[in-house]
Amino acid sequence: MKKRVVTAGTFDILHPGHYEILKFAKSLGDELIVIVARDETVKKLKGRKPIIPEEQRREMVEALKPVDKAILGSLKNKLEPILELKPDIIVLGPDQTTFDEETLKKELAKYNLYPEIVRFRGYKKCPFHSSFDIVKEIIRRFCNKEIKI
């Protein structure tokens, strides 16, 4: 039986850190499904809308080699896609703080789901390993007039 792995994230301004977590997640199983956060959800969590619209982020993530399928998250219940997908493994990113591993296990157990939950510890092999760092660098260069519009 195929081992299904699920991970989730915003994936706004793709960078090597995103690719590394997806490669890691895929290495744990046979099928990788990625849940891409909805624009409205990102705004609630981060206080700002993503730069890239949700459907475009979903398409970009799905185009990446490790990913078998990318879907948009639920606007009602963040656990809904996980309950539908019934993964064997859930991979959490290093900066995902909505759930810690134990809380997520307890929540899913209420629905008789017992996936292995793995925390990806991060990727910092390049200077731009986060979308926020990329945005900060663009602003820095623009303010220093290194970028002309």
Swiss-Prot record:
Gene behind this protein: ribL
Misc: Alkylation of both Cys-126 and Cys-143 results in complete loss of enzymatic activity.
Organism per entry: Methanocaldococcus jannaschii (strain ATCC 43067 / DSM 2661 / JAL-1 / JCM 10045 / NBRC 100440) (Methanococcus jannaschii)
InterPro entries linked to this entry: Archaeal_FAD_synthase (IPR050385), Cyt_trans-like (IPR004821), FAD_synth_RibL (IPR024902), Rossmann-like_a/b/a_fold (IPR014729)
Cofactor: Co(2+)
Inhibition and activation profile: Is inhibited by the product PPi.
Quaternary structure (record): Homodimer.
Uppermost EC category: transferase
NCBIfam families for this protein: cyt_tran_rel
GO molecular function, a single term: ATP binding
Keywords assigned: ATP-binding, FAD, Flavoprotein, FMN, Nucleotide-binding, Nucleotidyltransferase, Transferase
Pathway annotation from the record: Cofactor biosynthesis; FAD biosynthesis; FAD from FMN: step 1/1
Identification of the protein by name: FAD synthase
Recorded catalytic activity of this chain's protein: FMN + ATP + H(+) = FAD + diphosphate
